[in-house]
Curated annotation (Swiss-Prot):
This is Auxin-responsive protein IAA24. Residues 129-215 form the PB1 domain. The gene is IAA24. It comes from the Eukaryota. Residues 24-88, 109-128 are annotated as: Disordered. Belongs to the Aux/IAA family. It comes from Oryza sativa subsp. japonica (Rice).
């Protein structure tokens, strides 16, 4: 019995010594923790703990890097979204809608008026009379004559003679055979030409204005 009691005491002392040794071992963890890692030798493996800590540090670093990349991508996206706002600043202040509409309406009205005037002139030339202004040197007024009512240069001369108090007849009766007055006209190009140089049809299509000038100026 005595030997059995001594064996139990020895076993308890050995167990207590082993427990004290385990408590005195250095571990990675907060104080008071009782985390034990068993290996094939039955003790704690500090190298494994260091490897575990390094792995956790690497994961933390990757996590932070990923967060930074996401933040940078978000900032870049925000910059791209804000870029059109800067482009809209160009051309400030903007033209208001009613001003644009007014401008377009005025332009359309001017185009319609011009088109209507051209059509009216074309219809007048085709179906109605072909009136041109007539001026005479020394006369304070202008007259108009319808070229379509004349069949040639002779009838045109007679019509002008009636408009300006028979100036051509008076000149002929005075014995001035060379003529005191001459008839000229202004063509499409604005050039002044003498009446009778071109065929009658060409004359009435290009005549814009008639002028009765002195014969001395026509020479």
């Amino acid at each position: 019995m005595a030997s059995s009691s001594s064996l139990r005491s020895t076993s308890c002392l050995a167990s207590a010594a082993e427990t004290d040794a385990d408590n005195l071992c250095l571990r990675l963890g907060p104080p008071g923790s009782s985390i034990t890692t068993t290996t094939t030798t039955g003790g704690a493996d500090p190298a494994a703990k260091r490897s575990l800590g390094a792995k956790r540090s690497l994961e933390s670093t990757d996590s932070m890097a990923s967060g930074t990349g996401t933040s940078a991508a978000g900032d870049e996206h925000d910059d791209d979204t804000a870029a059109p706002a800067k482009a809209q600043v160009v051309g400030w202040p903007p033209v208001r809608a009613y001003r644009r509409n007014t401008f377009h309406q005025a332009a359309a009205a001017a185009a319609a008026t011009k088109k209507g005037g051209d059509e009216k002139q074309k219809q007048q030339q085709q179906g109605g009379g072909l009136y041109v202004k007539v001026s005479m040197d020394g006369a304070p007024y202008l007259r108009k004559v319808d070229l379509k009512m004349c069949k040639g240069y002779r009838e045109l001369r007679e019509a002008l003679d009636l408009l300006f108090t028979k100036c051509f007849s008076a000149t002929a009766s005075d014995g001035c055979s060379d003529g005191q007055f001459a008839i000229a006209y202004e063509d499409k190009d604005g050039d002044l030409m003498l009446v009778g140089d071109v065929p009658w049809e060409m004359f009435i299509s290009s005549c814009k204005k008639l002028r009765i000038m002195k014969g001395s100026e026509a020479r």
